[in-house]
Amino acid sequence: MAAISPANATTAASLSLPQFSSTSSSLSSSSSPSFLNFKTASVSNRCIKCGVRSLENHSGHRSLDFLSNGDPISLINPNSSSPITMAAATSESGSKSSKRVCLFHSDETRDLAERIVAKSDCIELRSINWKKFDDGFPNLFIQNAQGIRGQHVAFLASFSSPAVIFEQLSVIYALPKLFVSSFTLVLPFFPTGTSERMEDEGDVATAFTLARILSNIPTSRGGPTSLVTFDIHALQERFYFGDTILPCFESGIPLLKSRLQSLPDSDNISIAFPDDGAWKRFHKQLQHYPTIVCNKVRMGDKRIVRIKEGDAEGRHVVIVDDLVQSGGTLIECQKVLAAHGAAKISAYVTHGIFPRSSWKRFKLDTKGDPAEGLSYFWITDSCGMTVKEVMNKPPFEVLSLAGSIASALQV
């Protein structure tokens, strides 16, 4: 600590001491520290104790924390291990760790992209012109392409049908070549995930084909492309991707857990898995709930669902799976659980595909009969077309992946 007495005021002034106003004393009672900049001034006979908050230069001035009136003036140089210095360093490093991301999107994912941007000030929405030539092939234009040089760039894709995959792949392959700092592909639903089996000679595993295509996305200046996807169908599919892409596998289960905790009967919930595959995938994330496991058995030409283990009697049973298409398995599981005494039945899937509007098969339980309807059917917004169809149609509720994606873009 270096003390400066009033006798050395002239010398102190040459060191650019702060000039305090008559209201300086009120600053000491503020809950947050006040910052004063050094400037050449005469100290006169006034003695004030100050503490140096930071020794960094800001536009030629040094910043202080005002401490108190006192005698004499003291300039305190905090060492690197002091709490104030460490807190300042932590705050500065925290702000520097948040990266700004330019987010592009397909036509189908505009609504989800806007929700993602609303979740983070560090994500900026960018646009692409999606047009077609007269022959039907895509006519694409990335707006302000030079403006994304050196930026972190992400693309929110939706491979909802083979018709849109080619035009989006064209953009996905082009963006990393625009001198971007890094490139992240967000594909909430990996669409060919159910096509990974080769049971007969001649079967084509299209899941592996798409994984190979994505593995060959050009590298950006920062290195390989990052891929963010949610609840991919078969666990072994994570090994389909090559070494030139960095897959980040996320899950929608945390959204479900948060929603279940908000229910009035949250202490009476059991989780049912429609088959062993769903149990292997999700049981560790939901292990604090009582578990019911169903399976399919063949009876002649039919396959029926039975309860393998667990008790549904008097419980609010939530059927959990990664995706639903026609919904036949879920409906059979619902009937079996109701027959075993479930008080309520709800369902959750991360990806509600529902081809040919099969979502209409699921009705709301309005009479207290779980065999006839569901209390809730939760899906995420990974499939944008489905969300538009089921929005505000009970028993469906949409749990948005926007917050999870915004967090993943900061990895």
UniProtKB/Swiss-Prot annotation:
Transit peptide: first to last position: 1-39
UniProt subcellular location: Plastid, Chloroplast
GO process annotations (BP): nucleotide biosynthetic process
One Pfam entry name: Pribosyltran_N
InterPro entries reported for this sequence: Pribosyltran_N, PRibTrfase_dom, PRTase-like, Rib-P_diPkinase
Domain of life, per lineage: Eukaryota
EC main group: transferase
GO cellular component: chloroplast
GO molecular function, one term: ribose phosphate diphosphokinase activity
Entries under CDD domains matching the protein: PRTases_typeI
Catalysis performed (reactions): D-ribose 5-phosphate + ATP = 5-phospho-alpha-D-ribose 1-diphosphate + AMP + H(+)
Region called Binding of phosphoribosylpyrophosphate, residue ranges: 314-329
Listed transmembrane segments: none
Binding site for Mg(2+): D231, H233
EC number(s) recorded for this UniProt protein: 2.7.6.1
Alphabetic keyword roster: ATP-binding, Chloroplast, Kinase, Magnesium, Metal-binding, Nucleotide biosynthesis, Nucleotide-binding, Plastid, Transferase, Transit peptide
Record NCBIfam families: ribP_PPkin (TIGR01251)
Family to which this protein belongs: Belongs to the ribose-phosphate pyrophosphokinase family.
Name under which the protein is recorded: Ribose-phosphate pyrophosphokinase 3, chloroplastic
Taxonomic lineage of the native organism: Eukaryota, Viridiplantae, Streptophyta, Embryophyta, Tracheophyta
